[in-house]
Amino acid sequence: VYHVTYQYDKDLNNEIIAELNKVDGEFSMFNKQSTVTAFNNGKKVEASDMFMNVLTLSQDVSKDTYGAFDITVAPLVNAWGFGFKHQKMPDQQQVDSLKKLVGMQNIKVEKMNGKTYLSKKLKNMMLDFSAVAKGFGSDAVATVMRRHDIKNYMVEIGGEVATSGVSAQ
């Protein structure tokens, strides 16, 4: 769910939707065609500049927080029933086993012919960008606004907000 308001004489809805579709196509775990879904399903994926920018930012934040923020935590999240799989609470042995799947070191990065490819080092590890994707989507739509030299706008996606200027009200 998103809401965008801006002061401009043209309708930018199609451009906004196109930008949001790009973000969804990279980071949505609910989109069966997304890059992150392909990665999580065990495929080697070609990483776009957008994907690499968000991955690199996520790695930096993980490092800065000593691992408190980690986009590889999906197996643990799922074990507690917050993700796609709902099951009973994991016991300590399951938690210890799943913790081995968590960590940025489990992402294999290969550069070939000027392209970047990502794959898993461990079969059951997963990426989950849900902590950053909505904010990144808000920033991406804000970039559309700036590209059109729009000074006054508000972009809100799932509670993540990007603003500039003043309200028309």
What are these regions (language model features)?
Residues 134:
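Short, conserved phosphate/pyrophosphate- and ester-handling motifs at nucleotide-, phospho-/glycolipid
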Residues 137:
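Short active-site segment of divalent metal-dependent hydrolases/proteases
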Residues 140:
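Penicillin-binding protein/beta-lactamase superfamily catalytic region
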Residues 156:
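Conserved residues at the C-terminal ends of beta-strands
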Residues 151, 159-169:
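Hydrophobic/aromatic-rich core segments of domains that either
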Residues 1-130, 143-153:
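A contiguous, well-ordered beta/alpha segment that forms the leading edge of an enzyme domain
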